[in-house]
Amino acid sequence: MKVAITGISGRMGHTLIEAIQQDDRFSLVAAFTQEKSEEKNTRLVENLNLTPSPLLTHDFSELLAANPEVLIDFSAPQATLSLLAPSMQVSLPLIIGTTGFTETQKLEISKASQTLPIVLAPNFSV
């Protein structure tokens, strides 16, 4: 399964990368990063020992061009909400591990889940 991740530079991002690299059923095809510096992204790939190197991008349309089959999100509540509409447009299933949503934000995710497969599992790193 082709996987894309948001929040790649965080603790859970690192853990997910390790798990993906240890299981032949999964491949990391893209990662959404806030870094716009290609040099910093190159260092991130090297530091995380990403082999093969996935697409690192701050542009969601570029992430979608990598054709992921699922997007695992460990970002921030507002960033997660910004993923809903473009994910719905291409029917990209979401696994959301982000924490700190307000009740209103949870309702927005719930509405999106009526048309898009979404697993909302904050704190699943515990």
Question: Which role fits each region the language model picked out?
Answer:
Residues 126:
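Conserved anion/nucleotide-ligand pocket segment
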Residues 48-64, 72-80:
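Glycine-rich, highly charged phosphate/nucleotide-binding loops
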Residues 83-88, 97-121:
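Rossmann-fold NAD(P)-binding glycine/threonine-rich loop
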Residues 1-4:
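Extreme N-terminal starter segment of soluble prokaryotic enzymes
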Residues 22-48:
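NAD(P)-binding Rossmann-fold cofactor-contacting core
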Residues 27, 55, 93, 117-119:
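Proline-centered loop/turn at the N-terminus of a beta-strand
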Residues 6-18:
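N-terminal Rossmann NAD(P)H-binding glycine-rich loop of SDR-like oxidoreductase domains
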Residues 64-66, 74, 78-96, 108:
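Rossmann-fold NAD(P) dinucleotide-binding segment
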